[in-house]
Amino acid sequence: MQYVNGMDIVKSVYDEVKYLINYTTMPWTDLGEYEECSVQSIENPTEEGLIFKCIGEINTSPEIPLNVLYNANLQQIWDELCIESKKIEQLDSCNSVDYYSFGSPLGGAPRDFVFLRNFSVDFENKSAWVVIRSIHHESIPSPTYMKPSGWEFLQISPNKTRITLVVQINDLTIAPYLRINSVDLKRIYRNTGIQITHTLPNLIKYIKKNYKKEIENNFKKFKTPDLFNPNLNNNNNNNNNNNNNNNNNNNNNNNNNNNNNNNNQQQNIKNSNSNENNNNNSDSITNSNSNENLNEKDGKKILLPQLSEEFEFLDVDEELYDVDKTPTFMFKETSKTVGELEVNPVETGWNCFRKFNDYTFYYRDYDENSLDFACSGSSFIDASAEVIFSYIFSEYSCKIDQWTCGMKTLKKLDQVTSLERMSFRSVLAPKDVLSAVLVKQVNYFQKGIIFLGYRSLLKPSTIVKTGFWYSPSAYYIIPQERGCIIRYILKFRMYLPPSTYKIYPKKQILYVISEKTRATVEMIKYYSINPFYLHKRKQQEFPHWEGIDKFSELAEIFSNIQIRHSKPSLIINSPPNSNNHENEKKRKFRDNGINSTSISIPSTQFCFSSGGGSGGSSSSSSSTSSSLTFSPPQQLSSPTSSSSSSTFSNDSALIDNNQQLDINNNNDQEYLRFSENWESYITRKPFLLLISSGLHLRKPPKKKSPRYLESHNLKTCSLFDLLPYEMIQYIFTLMDATHLIRMSRTCKYFNRICLDDNIWRDLYNREFTKNSSDSLFKWSSIEDINLGTEKKQLLDLTFDHSKKKSNNSSPLSASSSSSSPSPPLLPPPPPPIPQLPDMLLENNNKYNNREQIQKNEHYWLNMFREKETINRHWRAGNGKVSNLRGHKGKISCLQMAPNQIFTGSKDKEFKSWNIATKQCESTTRCGASSVISFEKDNFTKLSTDIFPYCLFMHGIIRLGCSNGAIQHYNIATKEIEKEQRFLYVSNGFIFMKRDIYSYESNTVKLYDSETEQELQMIEIENTKINHCKIGRFENFCMIACTDKTVKLWDIDSNKTELVLNGHKGSVNCLDFLNDYQLITGSSDKTIRMWDIRNPSSAIHNIKSHSSKVKAISIYNNLRMCTGDEDSICLWNLEGSNEPNLLTTINNLSPVECLSIDDETMLAGFSDGEVSYYDFNSK
């Protein structure tokens, strides 16, 4: 890292952008025209990605578009896809650091950018330039990177400008942030530059809309025109009318109100009747039932509906939002919701309580009386976009949508926005019909993409009256070469006072709502493919609204029915449509207390927070006086609770323009002149940037160098005295630990530098994080995690991190290069560790002292020493041994937690041990069977894997028993809360969230834990199964058999794909080394290494054991331990293709199971003893 002159960086960016625009021999590919702008693209010759160029013309001077771009706050107004734009810091008159956030037309998560922007005028060549480059800034975490890009404004005639925009985008930015890894979605980006093609046309439309001759007159006076004021109303307001209105306001308030009503009605409701008389007074407008009345109140336009039949319940104007907004405000607000759910749901207070196929359901407690619900997902529908669109918010909604029983268009405000009146059934009282007025927007993007967004017209404070408040939600319909992908983001708020939960548990309410939402999407998919079936339906088959009166009946239906994916209209286990007389008898029977309501909810994995997951958990600080501190715009305050106001981020969609856009003080906004002496009106200031590895730029820190380095007494009497501290520090970062220690002994100056914690941090990342995996989480690498961040939300592990892989990927067809990840160019910052439940944090736990270590100025030095100590003890086998005694039978399974150890034995007991005291905390008797499997104990451990039990389902772990029972054990209460039983004998289990594998004798079966149904089964003839394991690819299961083979079971095809032959004895155990390699242990006293891409023979055959190998455990592809009847062998897997035996630990009893992490090892023996080896003991 080194400081560079900021203007040198700007000059290099300027030269690169100028080359891309003016070099005419580049083989550009013409992508067509979009709104009179031509779009071209070319493959980036220097890296994977594309370069897009968009060209258009406008009849103005270059000065106008140059200054529109100069005001960064304006882009969120004129750019339809820009969610937020803000100036972070003005370096000088021509250079600034600005923040931008852009939504994705494909429904992906928003992308944040921090740009260093430079403005210049080349008046000799009649052109002006804006060049940008991505940088890092301390106020914006993890922005998206974009290569140098920019604009050219070329004056081709006295009042005509050609605008050229060139943007370099890499493949990572091109790829949409969706769960579906669709090649067609990426092709849309590559073939159209869909986000780039909107920018220039939007700029041209904005200038044409607001550019008037009155503004041209202001240019001659060198004043900033109102065009560049972000407080300017975006509508085409006639200045003369405004002046007349102001004069009328001074003369007669009544006349002023009448004029404002008429003028604003013309400006904001474009689809008004063409023969409407503009001179009608307010009384004539009030008497019209088909029109709304727009009044000016406190400088804000609000919609005042009339007390007519259509708007009889909207009689309070203070409860209405302003609908006079940009055509894509719904798209921008929905994009914020996507960012909340897809990027950081925990930090924004969301809890993922259920996953089902492509559906993910979230909730959060907004306040004590209301709850937010959200559903996110995407699906493929083999139908055209027009057909799919016709079933969403249309006359067919009441036949398809399980929420809606009526839909009517009240008013068409313009070509994009309309008001819809929706009638829907109540959840808690299904016979009741509620009504709501929604604001709906339909946007048509390039390539036929349709965006349909909606939200409630009323303010959230009316939730007490209606029971529901619809937040910005949307459907994205994305055409493909065949069919469409529909992306849905559904979010609303429910009024549920605490008294409701006493009658209907929250779990039941959320489950019913999730099933209703899923049924709606499935209906849209089904009838879009088979539209002729819809017209044959004479009545609603689902969910029998006419026969349901209470929520308990509705919950009972949803707990028993099964919605078929192929034909959702045919409901399995759906109750018949009984008459009202029979239903009334049942209700009286239940109300009398003879048979209390007992709802059987399927065993969906729910994860509720204990009060901490409310919307009030995320906070946004207000803007400060420092220009370097970035803070988001002020959020809309909660109407019911001031403590939760900061979470209402997406509910500020329709606030007034002044509140939303007044980000910076625009009185000091400079103005650039397109003239020969333009530089005389600006000021230049030098600035420095800190460049790191030539990739990203960082703003220089304001901290001064340590005082002791400035002392004249500390000198080396060498050339080092002439070098700046940053350069000396960089030189020292290239040394290893041995040379750093030697240099620290030469002089006091070098000693102080060698103690710099930044040097040891870089050395630590270089030495110990190069082989770490990034696919899962693991607690054991706590030293790689920044423990300084406190009070973090509880991490919701219902998010399936294994989905980072492609569902269609196969280990048999993957390339060999994918097995070894390349190290990052820059050491990533340490990720924050989530806060664990209080029940798992103890004062005597050794991990609690790590936070005190980090506060030390030599934190990374101490961490490096600790890591070296662990490696040294591991190589020598000198771990501190603690024996855990208490079991009376052989150990069948064991697992480590942050401060606990769990063990299961053949003595039919399950024990929990405290790591610090090595004492048994609790003993649970598992009936007449023994515990044989834990949750996650059949998975390979990686360096980033966090212990799953304490974070999953409120500290619930599943225990597999030999009699086939699955018991749910609560770590906090140390009791069995629930028991499932859908098989009667088992030798082992593999738990994978909803899927459960069980093997016994010669069969392996796959069950659905929610429905308790058998999904797949494979039977292997003439052998017995000893062990099963699943690696990175969840659709492949490795099976160790007594016939001396290892078989790979393809779960999708239910076939044995390959067989590994080579062992001369029964294969007893196996573990995965990486994605494609595994190690097996056999009764022939050998361990073998295999590569399933080349299964003909083993890679290595290692003979180091004196008896049959019974257990194997691998940690992070770095270390391995194997156990037989007499000893435990420790192996090093780093830096060599073949495992390297480090040491052998002799034991008095045969080993039954092993488990290791970075610092410790657990061994369970046949005599019931458990040994705990701590390699970090000094």
Curated annotation (Swiss-Prot):
Residues 821-835 have a biased composition (Pro residues). InterPro entries: F-box-like_dom_sf, F-box_dom, START-like_dom_sf, START_lipid-bd_dom, WD40/YVTN_repeat-like_dom_sf, WD40_repeat_CS, WD40_repeat_dom_sf, WD40_rpt. WD repeats lie at residues 886-923, 925-979, 981-1017, 1020-1059, 1062-1100, 1104-1141, 1146-1178. Residues 223-296, 569-594, 618-649, 804-841 are annotated as: Disordered. Keywords: Repeat, Ubl conjugation pathway, WD repeat. GO terms for molecular function: lipid binding. Residues 1-208 form the START domain. It holds the Pfam family START. Residues 229-293, 571-580, 809-820 have a biased composition (Low complexity). Transmembrane segments: none annotated. Residues 717-763 form the F-box domain. Gene3D superfamilies: 1.20.1280.50, 3.30.530.20, YVTN repeat-like/Quinoprotein amine dehydrogenase. It comes from the Eukaryota. Substrate recognition component of a SCF (SKP1-CUL1-F-box protein) E3 ubiquitin-protein ligase complex which mediates the ubiquitination and subsequent proteasomal degradation of target proteins. This is F-box/WD repeat-containing protein A-like protein.
